[in-house]
Every structure is written in C-alpha cells, then in structure tokens.
Amino acid sequence: MTSHFALFDLEPDFRLDQDRLAVRYRELVRRVHPDRFAGAPEREQRLALEEAARLNEAYQTLKSPSQRARYLLSLQGEELSQETTVQDPAFLMQQMELREELQELQDSADLAGVARFKRRLVQDQEQLNEGFAACWADPRRRDEAERLARRMQFLDKLFAEVRQLEERLDD
C-alpha cells in the first residue's frame, strides 16, 4: 500500500511544506470528487469514494504534527498506542499541573486566562515539534523521538480540552 507521503509526492519527513501539502491535496481530491462520478458505473463511484476517503485520511494525518510523528514512527515499526502514558515523572507532574491550571481557569470562567494558557501550549507544541524533527533526522535518537511523540499526543488532548472550555465560556 502506498504511504501517505507517496500519495502527495512528498518525502517521508517530519518537516513538511504545509502549503504544498494542501495544494496537492486539493488537486488530488478534485480528481476523485463524487460529483465527477455521478453518471459513472457503481464500481467506479465506489472506487472514487474509497480513494477520496484515503486521501482525506492521509491529509489529516500529515497535516497534524502529532499524527504525522506517530505515522512516521509506525513506518519504522514503532506503534504508539493512544492510551500509553509517558513514564517520565517530571512530565507527568507537568501534566498534572497543567490540568489543575485548566480546571482553575474553568472554575473562574477566565476567558483571558484561557487565551494565555493556550498561547503557552502553542509554544510548548512548537518546541516539541522542533525537538521531534531534530530527533527524527538522527536515526540514533528514535527512542527520544518516540518519547516526544507521546508528549505531543498529550498536548493534543489538552488542546481539545481547551477548545471545549473556550466554547463553554463563550456561550
């Protein structure tokens, strides 16, 4: 089966030109859009739908830094479970502190505080992305890359919680 990277004519690397990925995605998905196959035989319609779904999945995976990191690791035979926790005590403590801070922001309905919290998370995410990219470039650092990918997963979950909180506070 063709890799997500090959679908978009990209080299398998963590650093991606997101604009190029988006342009290529739009080009490819336009070719298999269901409207183009409305009068086609049922088999062709089904194949076009399957290809569109495959392109969507690949695009969503490559667009997200944490999903892209997990995918790269999976190409090397390293499967990261969504449920596996980080075994780093310092990071576990940081997770607890961040969750407590988010809970306090929720309890106080502090929308400005949530915005500041989110900016800090964005900075943390950028640091993790840079760290993963550096580790990925060096095959001897794959264990560290895996550790960073797990941290990226945690931040993704925390971002989802922040978005939910923002929606509740906006109502």
UniProtKB/Swiss-Prot annotation:
Q: Name one GO biological process term.
A: [2Fe-2S] cluster assembly
CDD domains, A to Z: DnaJ
Q: Which residues form the J domain?
A: 3-75
- Note the InterPro entries from the entry: DnaJ_domain, HscB, HscB_C_sf, HscB_oligo_C, J_dom_sf
GO molecular-function term, one example from the UniProt record? ATPase activator activity
Relate the protein's function as given in its record.
Co-chaperone involved in the maturation of iron-sulfur cluster-containing proteins. Seems to help targeting proteins to be folded toward HscA.
Q: Family, per the entry?
A: Belongs to the HscB family.
Q: What is the name listed in the Swiss-Prot or TrEMBL entry for this protein?
A: Co-chaperone protein HscB homolog
Q: Which source organism does the UniProt entry give?
A: Azotobacter vinelandii
